[in-house]
Amino acid sequence: MPDELDGGNNFGSLDCTGRRYNYAGQTYRLCDVDEDARYLASPSTNDLYFDPDATYPPPLKPDGSSYPDADYTNAWVDGYAAARTDNPVTVDLGTRYAALMDPYFHGGGFMLADGTDPNGYLDEAFYYELQDGSGCDTLIPPDSCFSARKHPSTDEEKQAFANWYAYYRTRELSSRLGITEAFIDQPESMRIGYDTINSSWVERGVRPFSGEDRTEFFEWLQTHNAGGGTPLRNALDTIGGYYESESDEGPWADEPGVEDGQSADTFIECRQSAAILMTDGYYSGGNPGVGNVDGSNGDGISGPDSETYTYESGSPYADEHSNTLADVAMEYWVRDLQPSVA
């Protein structure tokens, strides 16, 4: 935390215990940020970390009401999960806070007994403040540029830290909160679908953003845990294929998801549609093999009033690279996905 290390230890050389440790409901190696890594626990150099000058209100529930404030001495590891279970995992931020841990522990050795802390890595919740000085304006300032550990000192600051810990501290938690705020006031006339980027089909096609469909979207968003790689190109290709569907249950039907025999030539024309991809990094995984789409001229597209459009390869879209994420996006933008629609 705020986000765990990856297998390649992308944060550089950190002092992490080689013993496996049961903490916050999972098995980790605990890491010490007080030596050569203070920048990870300062809001000046890590935008995701707790900022004493910021406010951290609880996120919104699917019905628009707020989740409860977290408890500083019994803070939820996942504030969203706390609403779904009678026995949520919690941490006492007054005595047992760990700023960073590594889930990719060594397979050998033995598990440390729960509750022990032989290396002294657990402490009261803390943060570092960046100081002025020579060499302190670099991307990763040395430890000498930071203050000693500062702990929440007022009830207001402790409440803010507890809420940050329960609802904001990781990219996944922050994404849930931000997406909820972005969509909570969207009109019911909008159609929303959703999926994970690791699946080979669209989990939930577009539906009117109302009633049970609206509630189910927020519940899925706030309960789904991230996992696996980031095959963004294949994910976008899957969505593009979905938008090409002429099924009476497909995205262009009057009632998507309902099998009613509607023919494709009666679908509504010129309906604006988009796909939003959320990821924690660059794309990986398979290659859909679309080629250098943005580097080639497109076919003509007919529109209303006998108007036509043809993509002509050029700046700012064209390049010399094939099968990029931009090529997949262009593949489904440059073509008429529903040529039979009148």
State what each model feature region is.
Residues 1-342:
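P/S/T/G-enriched low-complexity
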